Swiss-Prot record:
Protein name (database record): Nitrite reductase [NAD(P)H]
Gene3D superfamilies in the record: FAD/NAD(P)-binding domain (3.50.50.60)
Subunit structure: Homodimer.
Pfam families xrefs: Pyr_redox_2 (PF07992)
């Protein structure tokens, strides 16, 4: 039986510790999809991932959304580029099965935005122009599948009881915890 190769992603392959980041041995190219789904620079990029609201509406119309079983709660701490990319992927793969409810907690008062585009913000002064997804995208997901808390800081993680505590004292339970807080200098 042939050995199964690991899924190629940017960064470090977790088992071998080998770097696959460009210009790594395998020359994996970074893939950034546009919200209109027109970019696909590798065979792994799926432009359909960027059309979630239309897929949700289509599946609801056909009655194909699975709402009949208990779902696991995924809490994502961080609503930056990595956090929203994770949410987009999970929503894409879970859209029909509906195995997960997602709660995202972001420290900033805005939805996920393109921090690289901050220089253009100072020209136009409209933060909405920097949003990675419009506000309507978040509310277009199937009922109860995606909730977000803005301007909320997670101050404590209790892994034994599977809860995170916020600066306002709210405890949020989880089945799966994803930390996507980014970095600071």
């Amino acid at each position: 039986m042939a050995a199964t190769l690991p899924l190629l992603t940017q960064g470090i392959e977790p088992v071998s510790g080998e770097s696959y980041s460009p210009p790594g041995e395998r020359h994996v190219q970074a893939t950034w999809g546009s919200k209109d789904g027109n970019i696909s620079n590798t065979e792994w990029n799926d432009p359909e991932a960027n059309r979630l609201p239309e897929k949700v509406a289509e599946l609801e119309k056909k009655g194909e959304l699975n709402n009949s079983h208990p779902r696991r709660r995924v809490v994502v701490v961080g609503l930056g580029m990595v956090g929203v990319a994770f949410i987009e992927k999970l929503m894409k793969y879970d859209i029909k099965r509906r195995e997960y409810d997602i709660i995202v907690i972001g420290e900033e008062p805005h939805l996920a935005y393109n921090r690289v585009g901050l220089t253009s913000f100072f020209q136009h002064r409209q933060v909405e122009n920097l949003y990675l997804n419009p506000q309507e995208w978040y509310s277009s997901m199937p009922e109860d599948s995606l909730h977000y808390h803005l301007n909320t800081l997670v101050t404590e993680i209790d892994s034994e009881n599977k809860t995170v505590k916020t600066s306002s004292g709210q405890a949020v339970s989880y089945d799966i915890l994803v930390l996507a807080t980014g970095s600071s200098s």
